[in-house]
Amino acid sequence: MIVVYALCLSFVLFSCIEPPVKNAANLAVKRTIRPEFAEGFVIEELSDSSFRITLLNLEKLPDTLQQIRWKPQTLNSIACLSTTHLPFIKALEQLPILKGTGFSDLVIDPEVRAMIDRGEVANLTVGHQLDEEKVFGTAPDLMFVYPYGGEAYAKFLDAGIGCVQISEYLEKSPLGRAEWIRLFGVLFDKEQQADSVFQNIKSAYQAEANRVLTSAAERPTVFTGSYDGGFWYMPPGNSFAARLIEDAGGHYVYVDSISSGNLVFPFEKILTDAHDCDFWGKIIYEKGPLTAEKLTEGDARLQGFKSFQSRSVFYCNAAETDYHGQAVLEPHLMLSDMIAVFHPEIHQQHAPAYFRKWE
């Protein structure tokens, strides 16, 4: 039985194959599942064994983005709009019922890639746009979507397609992103399995972070970001990237900044603040050899930075690694990669999974 009804912002959306259970507000709460690291969801199990899932707006906390009433049930088909949803689906052994994904051309996971190539999983996007006809044609029982696009989602809900808004990518910590598997665990009726997966990730991540605390003597300075149109875009100090750098034993140059979005600076400020940083980190999407011109995006001024001169540039190439997929459940591997960059004495024989030094 598919039962989903959601309060999204200021309006109510209903989607159900069978009528939703009534009077949920009058049901007692048996237990509350509060994430340890994630800030974007809270789950309550009610006295009738259904769940009330509250999804929070991570860009406007503590506002509620969506509230779902969920009954444990057998799902026959699911879909997702982001490649970052796929690792959660795979880890909980739900790939056999996956019928569609967004941005299928960017999928790197070999098992999902093979399903797409065989025509078993449809591409639900055209360019950067949602293909509504494909969604209706696929008609999944449940679809994991981005935390925006309310008008389209209302149409899907009216057609009986349950929509759950997933915003793991807005979490400010690596473990916060990974902990969203616990939400998927409730939806797939695999709560214990999801908790076990997350606890293993948490233990591995914290073990790596503790190695830095006990072994690293110094913390090299680090900057990151990209240059576009005369401005430098960098994550703030309260971000996923900053937390990863700090946990790896680096000192992020803007660690004290607090912002709900990227920091945007003119190049002249970066020239002052980051010119002498020990390391420069980047997320890139490049096929083929990474040249100095590609790395600096054609701006020769960057070649004068200390990090460039000493070849202390590290990067993750999203064209060659599953950074926009499996990495969400492998923060411990990303952390290990960065530790090997900043403190090679700790990981002397390290094989990078995501981040590596520019050679």
Model-derived features with residue positions:
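Short, structured coil segments at secondary-structure junctions
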Residues: 94, 159-161, 248-249, 309
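A ligand-binding cleft/hinge motif common to bilobed small-molecule-binding domains
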Residues: 148-158, 284-296
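Bacterial Sec-dependent N-terminal signal peptides
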Residues: 1-23
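Bacterial Sec-exported substrate-binding components of ABC uptake systems
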Residues: 16-86, 193-223, 289, 296, ...
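A short, structured surface patch at a secondary-structure boundary
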Residues: 54-63, 70-148
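Short glycine/proline-rich, acidic loop/turn segments that cap or connect secondary-structure elements
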Residues: 300-316
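Flexible, glycine-rich surface segments
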Residues: 208-293
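Extracytoplasmic substrate-binding proteins
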Residues: 120, 131, 137-231, 255-256, ...
